[in-house]
Amino acid sequence: TQQLTLKRDYDFAVTFFALNTWTGSSTGNDIVPGNKWDTANGDPIKDIRKEIRAMKKKTGIKPNKMVYGAAAWDVVLDNPAVIDRIKYGQSSPNNPAFTNEQTIAAILGLEQIVVADIVYNTSEEGAADSMDFIFTEDSALLLYAAATPGILMPSAGYIFTWRQYLASTSGLRIMRMRNDLARSDRIEGEMAYAMKIVASDLGVLFKTVDT
């Protein structure tokens, strides 16, 4: 099951974190911050808010979610402009002022922030392990994702699943079968889905956000 879900995450990253795919930004292209987010003059909140306005102005729809690569999220947490916004927050020994996904989502007016820090082994079977992040580390995707799917419901993208075949809304099925002759159980997993960008103007990809 873990290997299948890793494959699904990999396909998601390849599809939705692809370069030169999204057009919802102020430039119509991917955004490279003029001041990197790990520098003294970098301000991820200002940069992201600019693109939130740009998408709203272009489409009439305000983005509601953001997905960060591991390094992109780390530089946001350590960014002086971000720290300055929350350093006077209420704190106690049991509830210190800190920055997490909910804090940044609240500042940006987003419903959800996801940190995509999933790791996989890139080497061939039997070779020495070569571990890496599935999602591009220094990138972040700002997007609008519909709460519920619908033919007339705008959304940056959808994951279409073959539910009649798998009898599963997730597009994943695990089967366990007994082989009495071999005195063993056979476990099979299969997936049937397609990941598609359906509205490229409802997404903005930030890339190379750190130095």
Predicted features, each with a name:
Residues T1-K62, A70-S92, T208-T211:
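Alpha-helical scaffold segments that mediate packing/assembly in large oligomeric complexes
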Residues Y68-A70, Y144-A145:
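Short His-Asn-centered micro-motif
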Residues K65-G69, V114-V115:
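A structural signal for short, well-ordered beta-strand segments and their strand-loop junctions
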Residues I31-D43, I83-T211:
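Sequence/fold signature of self-assembling virion shell proteins
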